[in-house]
Amino acid sequence: MDWQTLLTRERLGKPVHSNDELGRSAFHKDHDRIIFSGAFRRLGRKTQVHPVSSNDHIHTRLTHSLEVACVGRSLGMRVGEILRDELPEWCDPSDLGVIVQSACLAHDIGNPPFGHSGEDAIRNWFQQAAGRGWLDEMSDAERSDFLHFEGNAQGFRVLTQLEYHQFDGGTRLTYATLGTYLKYPWTSRHAESLGYKKHKFGCYQSELPLLEQITQKLGMPQLDDEQWARHPLVYLMEAADDICYGLIDLEDGLEMELLEYSEVEALLLGLVGDDLPDTYRQLGPRDSRRRKLAILRGKAIEHLTNAAARAFVDQQQALLAGRLGGDLVEHMHGPAKLCVQRAKAIAREKIFQDKRKTLHEIGAYTTLEILLNAFCGAALEQYGGHTPSFKSRRILDLLGRNAPDPQWPLYRAFLQVIDFIAGMTDSYATEMAREMTGRSSPV
């Protein structure tokens, strides 16, 4: 791979890239299109790790995505400055920052309500549906898309098909930004066989022609049938997510009183050492722990960002060859790598086991089971031109102009249902499930 091709400004759905406006490049337009999309806006009412809370300090998918985008921009700009002489003459180092920032903004845009619990619930429902014979009309590859449902593949569909120009390029982002978004540039046929990325994939069968087009435009080498090497900038987006995930989980753990401030402080001090800002040294006992943590977190992110940028530059040849094993965190050195790994371990041991989170996950399964039974059941009932019951007709009416056609293949009809359900916020999904079961909230 080479940077000239990897950083193309050409857009999906348009034969040539549009002219840059004064102070606004093609990549800035990508950023703006994502920010103003309905799918991005709805992240504000979707679970990050913990249930959407009355405590406004707890992260949602939206605040998490914004923070990841900030770190991703810094990573892209630092790498761009270091590699300035290797970039195309029309490309400014800051362009790398905007590309990575945009991909970071969109990295969770396909996640269903209730976060990873929602993904698990959808996969579990389709496994049961397969046992009932509901998926028998599909090919093995199509059936696999549902059995391995993945927010990353749904996000790719949102960006390339559903938002703005429906089924005509979607958001029509540049190929460079789409390539940087594609964390897993392969289909579900590889979801069981790729080591540390096991169970992950980034593209449904319905979007495979678009994936082929994008990888061809970017010069991403094909490794196997329906599998391509990753765009190098994906590793910066992934590192930004890892950095924020690790630190954000600890902050939320403190807010929910699942962790002691002293253990979080010790972890971050182990990373930054004596490199503390004067504002931190001047803090006294009357200063809040939130203020202390904010200052310490900022310095920690600086250290982790520097370490990730160094790892990227050190591994540039392997990245361009499409053969880097693992993620950038694995290629960091010293305290930075240990900090991220230890932060994730603390989250697994002390945060993810919280009773409130467990109850939320159980509720997610119940809610999504109700919705999938209703909408997929109605789509199945009318499949092949059969006349659905009155109830099923009313259920399909809720989809409006996006309701599946009775003559469509069942794969396409179920995808249309998933588009609707995966796009819901936690609160909307919960309320609709309540109303469908006759248990709507009292007026």
From Swiss-Prot:
GO molecular function (one): dGTPase activity
Keywords: Hydrolase
A biological process term (GO) from this entry: dGTP catabolic process
Domain HD: 61-246
Pfam families, alphabetized: HD
InterPro entries in the cross-refs: dGTP_triP_hydro_central_sf, dGTP_triphosphohydrolase_C, dGTPase, dGTPase-like, dNTPase_3, HD/PDEase_dom, HD_domain
Coiled-coil residue windows: none
PANTHER family documented for this protein: DEOXYGUANOSINETRIPHOSPHATE TRIPHOSPHOHYDROLASE-LIKE PROTEIN 2 (PTHR11373:SF40), DEOXYNUCLEOSIDE TRIPHOSPHATE TRIPHOSPHOHYDROLASE (PTHR11373)
Family of the protein in this entry: Belongs to the dGTPase family. Type 3 subfamily.
The name this protein goes by in its record: Deoxyguanosinetriphosphate triphosphohydrolase-like protein
Organism: Pseudomonas paraeruginosa (strain DSM 24068 / PA7) (Pseudomonas aeruginosa (strain PA7))
